[in-house]
Amino acid sequence: MLSIDLNCDCGESYGAFQIGDDEGILPFVSSANIACGGHAGDPIVMRHTVRRCRELGVAVGAHPSYPDLHGFGRRVLPMSPAEIEAWVLAQIGALAAIARAEGVELRHVKPHGALYNVAARDHVVATAVARAVAAFSHELALVGLADSALIDAGREMGLPVLAEAFADRAYEADGRLRDRRYPDALIIDPTACLKQTLSIVRDGVVIAIDGTPVPLQADTICVHGDTPGAAARAAALRHGLEAAGITVRTPR
């Protein structure tokens, strides 16, 4: 029987700023990537999100970023590999401490935003991220864009790796995610999200924005929680996958 991990980025509120629909989306995913202070996620939010994941049986992972609260982690900051490694390690440690206090162990690490995108193509940055994960624990899985430099760096460090694809992001013909600057970069329609996900999981193919079929093997599928209608899309994905005979579960 086919199975797939369904993950979401969450815990991205901070202080008075509320971002995303965690309560609406978490019941439908199997893994959660929790912001840990770099771009969002203060200690109160982190603890609440970990508790909610524990209640729902959702696997918990860290979602570190460039130290960029003002830009929500979507800006590329000029940092050395050593600085990136230290910042990622610190964020993993912060969430791990809170999780352990709640009786939860981290399962994976997925970079956020600009750090995710740069690590997908820049082996130096990817290696810095992988070093941080390995320094914390070789048991943590490193999540990165399928067929990316980050997946390669994780393997080189001896880490378990999870190749990620997206239910709600459009792809270019070369396999890159379509830049968010374009209005068609996000897939909002739940039916379209399910169609893309089924193609990836069952056929190992995603249809690019220009109609090109692109080979894509994924261990985990991300659905974003910070866009309008996120909960409805997550529900449609979960129910649609199960109706197609595909089990939604953590990969290990």
From Swiss-Prot:
GO terms for biological process: carbohydrate metabolic process. GO terms for molecular function: 5-oxoprolinase (ATP-hydrolyzing) activity; ATP binding. It holds the Pfam family LamB_YcsF. It catalyses: 5-oxo-L-proline + ATP + 2 H2O = L-glutamate + ADP + phosphate + H(+). Its EC number is 3.5.2.9. InterPro entries: Glyco_hydro/deAcase_b/a-brl, LamB/YcsF/PxpA-like. Keywords: ATP-binding, Hydrolase, Nucleotide-binding. NCBIfam families: PRK05406.1-3, PRK05406.1-5. Forms a complex composed of PxpA, PxpB and PxpC. Belongs to the LamB/PxpA family. PANTHER family: 5-OXOPROLINASE SUBUNIT A, UNCHARACTERIZED PROTEIN YBGL-RELATED. This is 5-oxoprolinase subunit A.
